[in-house]
């Protein structure tokens, strides 16, 4: 038993040591090696136990945690980010965050905190971000919450129950990059509550009613740079100027987001912007203009310009009574100093000529995502309209003719940049007229399939991305930047068309290859973005991309965005990491080697066939098979001859005068087959030989020096040789008419040579006394 306890203790010690320094991972959390723990949306009712000093970031948002205790986080001394948003937290004990001196990010938004305590935040001297939006507290506490948060840069407070801003609320804060206050139902504002904050870069104020807004604005004039007003109904907004326009202000920008404006409140906004003389930019986003454009306030006539306003941005403006709206002529004079105007997605179909002429300082005009057509654009760009305009953006309107659009804009003498992308032009005329100073033209996403001389020669920047171009064959001598992504090109454009090119973007399934020669031909090219294409990873392409040392200096998205699409076995691999086999990369050499090997094999086979008479074997086999396959016109006949005699023409005297006499005139007579006498005239000689041998019981070869030299005797000997193998019999009778060396018989007739070596053959005797015995033996051999 003691031994078992000792073993358990040792194992426990080892496990404990192995876990030292690594954050404990309760089952409800997932932690990575860097100490980032994720416990979002896991229906947790409390903060998990077992958290250690190794935890650097803890996200427990979207759970059901109801409280935070003093001991829940006391070991997390290195914690930098704590997210407890969207829980049910209603209680936080006084010392819950006492050990979190390294904490920089704290999110307690959307909980049920009815009271806030300064003791929570007192230890958090490193805190930079604090979000307290969306609970149920009505004030920011009895004492200053943030007086010890000297490093705080982003603060978000307030909720729909928040009713009061007090003078002490922001004490101790001197500089904030962003302050967001949900003051939807704010009822009381203590004057000078923001005075303690010396600088606020961005104030986001959500207010339903604007009653307290003027007072807040006046309090922040000297400390605020950017004011954003959200979700406000300005029907009762009234700004009473307390003095001449304020010059000692920091505010540079106003944003009205989801704000409802009436004709009357518009007049008040104009007065406000005029009073805050430093405002240079005004933005209206998702706003509603609930009026008819009847701006009748007498004071507006006294205002010739709106302070220093230079930039006006309007996005998604809604005008419920759009078709009853007036022409805005009463405020034309207010626009003369505006330099930049953006009106997006607001159903603009016309800028009246008179308004265009009043926009004397306008340099930038963006009318994207509206209803402009060529006919109304002509009225907008009338003579003396927009005299200073340099940039015009008409993206995603209803323009349909490139020729008409260019001709309409000829009145804009200073226009250098034009964006008419995402219009439905579909085609490009052969020639066009454009303002003479045009340097930039955006024709992306206009569905054209070819380029013509319509493109102005003065361009330095051309964007023709996302079209249906199959080729680029247009000379543009001054173009320095070309954007041609998402087209149907196969390779880079010819460098001779673009001699001054510095930057080219040709990514996203536009090309499938390019070469070193093509890249080098662009002598001034400094930047190329060609990633995201379906590259054919050929051996040449891989060799170039992997051997070129300076490729990453030109290709700005190399190597991450360069992937192979083919061959299929390397699809999806990075071009930089892809390698093909020797057989794929040296196909010509491989084919040459195979051809050489094949040629040598054929040559060797030919030599062997010649040496071993292979050609003869094939020729004879073919002839034999052809003869065997020929249809028989007559029924199969029996043996017609006792013997077929194969002999040389020079030995015909011996055969015809001696052999024939002795055999055919013998009683009973033998029937011999002689080629001179019995071959059928007109029949193929080889067929005659084969038929005669097949119809004969035996084949007699009259061997002599003449026989060996005779070509036809060789044929007869050849086919007899096949018969020996075909029928496996000994039908051959050899007669040596004169002494002959066995070696004179060709070696390919192995069967005949074997017969001469293993069986008796007849030799013609010169002695007449022995000739009778010769004939006797021959007759016996034929009968056998």
From Swiss-Prot:
Instruction: Provide Cytoplasmic-side residue ranges.
Output: 609-784
Short motif ATG16L1-binding motif, span: 761-778
Q: List the disulfide bonds.
A: 31-37, 353-382, 432-454
Q: Residue limits of the LRRCT domain?
A: 525-579
Q: Where on this protein does the Glycyl lysine isopeptide (Lys-Gly) (interchain with G-Cter in ubiquitin) crosslink form?
A: 754
Cellular location(s)? Membrane; Cytoplasmic vesicle, Phagosome membrane; Membrane raft
Q: Which UniProt keywords apply?
A: Cytoplasmic vesicle, Disulfide bond, Glycoprotein, Immunity, Inflammatory response, Innate immunity, Isopeptide bond, Leucine-rich repeat, Membrane, NAD, Receptor, Repeat, Signal, Transmembrane, Transmembrane helix, Ubl conjugation
Which GO molecular function annotation, any one, does this entry have? triacyl lipopeptide binding
Report whether Membrane shows up as a keyword of the record: yes
Residue ranges of LRR repeats: 54-77, 78-101, 102-125, 126-150, 151-175, 176-199, 200-223, 224-250, 251-278, 279-308, 309-337, 338-361, 362-388, 389-414, 415-437, 438-457, 458-478, 479-500, 501-524
| UniProt main location, coarse | membrane
Membrane association type? Single-pass type I membrane protein
Q: Extracellular side of the membrane: what ranges?
A: 21-587
- Describe its function: Cooperates with LY96 to mediate the innate immune response to bacterial lipoproteins and other microbial cell wall components. Cooperates with TLR1 or TLR6 to mediate the innate immune response to bacterial lipoproteins or lipopeptides. Acts via MYD88 and TRAF6, leading to NF-kappa-B activation, cytokine secretion and the inflammatory response. May also promote apoptosis in response to lipoproteins.
Domain-related comment: Ester-bound lipid substrates are bound through a crevice formed between the LRR 11 and LRR 12. The ATG16L1-binding motif mediates interaction with ATG16L1.
| Assembly description | Interacts with LY96, TLR1 and TLR6 (via extracellular domain). TLR2 seems to exist in heterodimers with either TLR1 or TLR6 before stimulation by the ligand. The heterodimers form bigger oligomers in response to their corresponding ligands as well as further heterotypic associations with other receptors such as CD14 and/or CD36. Binds MYD88 (via TIR domain). Interacts with TICAM1. Interacts with CNPY3. Interacts with ATG16L1. Interacts with PPP1R11. Interacts with TICAM2. Interacts with TIRAP.
What name goes with this protein?
Answer: Toll-like receptor 2
Q: Which organism is it from?
A: Equus caballus (Horse)
């Amino acid at each position: 038993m003691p031994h078992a306890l000792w073993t358990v203790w040792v194992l426990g010690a080892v496990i404990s040591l192995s876990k030292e320094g690594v954050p404990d991972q309760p089952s409800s959390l997932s932690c990575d090696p860097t100490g980032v723990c994720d416990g979002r949306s896991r229906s947790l009712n409390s903060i998990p136990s077992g958290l250690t000093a190794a935890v650097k970031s803890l996200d427990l948002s979207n759970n059901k945690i109801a409280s935070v205790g003093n001991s829940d986080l006391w070991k997390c001394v290195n914690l930098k980010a704590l997210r407890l948003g969207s829980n049910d937290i209603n209680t936080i004990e006084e010392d819950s965050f006492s050990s979190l001196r390294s904490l920089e990010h704290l999110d307690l938004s959307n909980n049920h905190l009815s009271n806030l305590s300064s003791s929570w935040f007192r230890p958090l001297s490193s805190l930079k971000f604090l979000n307290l939006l969306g609970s149920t507290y009505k004030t920011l506490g009895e004492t200053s919450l943030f007086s010890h948060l000297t490093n705080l840069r982003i603060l978000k407070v307030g909720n729909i129950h928040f009713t009061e801003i007090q003078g002490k609320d922001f004490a101790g804060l001197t500089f904030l990059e962003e302050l967001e206050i949900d003051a939807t139902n704010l009822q009381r504002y203590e004057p000078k509550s923001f005075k303690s904050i010396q600088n606020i870069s961005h104030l986001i104020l959500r207010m339903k009613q604007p009653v307290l807004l003027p007072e807040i604005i006046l309090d922040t004039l000297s400390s605020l740079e950017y004011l954003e007003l959200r979700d406000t109904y300005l029907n009762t907004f009234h700004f009473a100027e307390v003095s001449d326009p304020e010059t000692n202000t920091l505010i540079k920008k106003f944003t009205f987001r989801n704000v409802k404006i009436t004709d009357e409140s518009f007049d008040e906004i104009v007065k406000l912007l005029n009073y805050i003389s430093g405002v240079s930019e005004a933005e209206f986003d998702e706003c509603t203009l609930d009026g008819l454009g009847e701006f009748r306030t007498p004071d507006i006539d006294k205002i010739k310009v709106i302070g220093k306003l230079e930039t006006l941005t309007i996005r998604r403006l809604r005008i419920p009574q759009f078709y009853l709206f007036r022409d805005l002529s009463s405020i034309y004079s207010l626009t003369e100093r505006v330099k930049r105007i953006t009106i997006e997605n607001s159903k603009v179909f016309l800028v009246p000529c008179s308004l265009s002429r009043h926009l004397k300082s306008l340099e930038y005009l963006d009318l994207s995502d509206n209803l402009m057509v060529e006919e109304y654009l002509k009225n907008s760009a009338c003579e003396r309209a927009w005299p200073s305009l340099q940039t015009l953006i008409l993206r995603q309107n209803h323009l349909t003719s490139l020729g008409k659009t260019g001709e309409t804009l000829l009145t804009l003498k200073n226009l250098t940049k034009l964006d008419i992308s995402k219009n439905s032009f579909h085609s490009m005329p052969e020639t066009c007229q454009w303002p003479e100073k045009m340097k930039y033209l955006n024709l992306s996403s206009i569905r054209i399939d070819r380029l013509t001389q319509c493109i102005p020669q003065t361009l330095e920047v051309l964007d023709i991305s996302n079209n249906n171009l199959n080729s680029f064959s247009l000379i543009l001598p001054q173009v320095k930047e070309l954007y041609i992504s998402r087209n149907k090109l196969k390779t880079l454009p010819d460098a001779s068309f673009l001699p001054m090119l510095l930057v080219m973007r040709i990514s996203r399934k536009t090309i499938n290859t390019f070469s070193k020669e093509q890249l080098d031909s662009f002598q001034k090219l400094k930047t190329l973005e060609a990633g995201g294409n379906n590259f054919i990873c050929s051996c040449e392409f891989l060799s170039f991309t992997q051997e070129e040392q300076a490729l990453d200096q030109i290709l700005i998205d190399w190597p991450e965005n360069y992937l192979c699409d083919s061959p299929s076995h390397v699809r999806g691999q990075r071009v930089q990491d892809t390698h093909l086999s020797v057989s794929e990369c040296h196909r010509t050499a491989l084919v040459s080697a195979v051809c050489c090997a094949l040629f040598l094999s054929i040559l060797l086979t030919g030599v062997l066939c010649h040496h071993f008479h292979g050609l003869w074997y094939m020729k004879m086999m073919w002839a034999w098979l052809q003869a065997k396959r020929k249809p028989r016109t007559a029924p199969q006949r029996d043996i017609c001859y006792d013997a077929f005699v194969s002999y040389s023409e020079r030995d015909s005297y011996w055969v015809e005068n001696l052999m024939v006499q002795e055999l055919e005139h013998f009683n009973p007579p033998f029937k011999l087959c002689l080629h001179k006498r019995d071959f059928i005239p007109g029949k193929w000689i080889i067929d005659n030989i084969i038929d005669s041998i097949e119809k004969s019981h035996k084949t007699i070869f009259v061997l002599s020096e003449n026989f060996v030299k005779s070509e036809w005797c060789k044929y007869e000997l050849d086919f007899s040789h096949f018969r020996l193998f075909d029928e496996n019999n000994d039908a051959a009778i050899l007669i040596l008419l004169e002494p002959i060396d066995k070696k004179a018989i060709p070696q390919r007739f192995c069967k005949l040579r074997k017969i001469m070596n293993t069986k008796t053959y007849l030799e013609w005797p010169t002695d007449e006394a022995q000739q009778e015995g010769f004939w006797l033996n021959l007759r016996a051999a034929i009968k056998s």
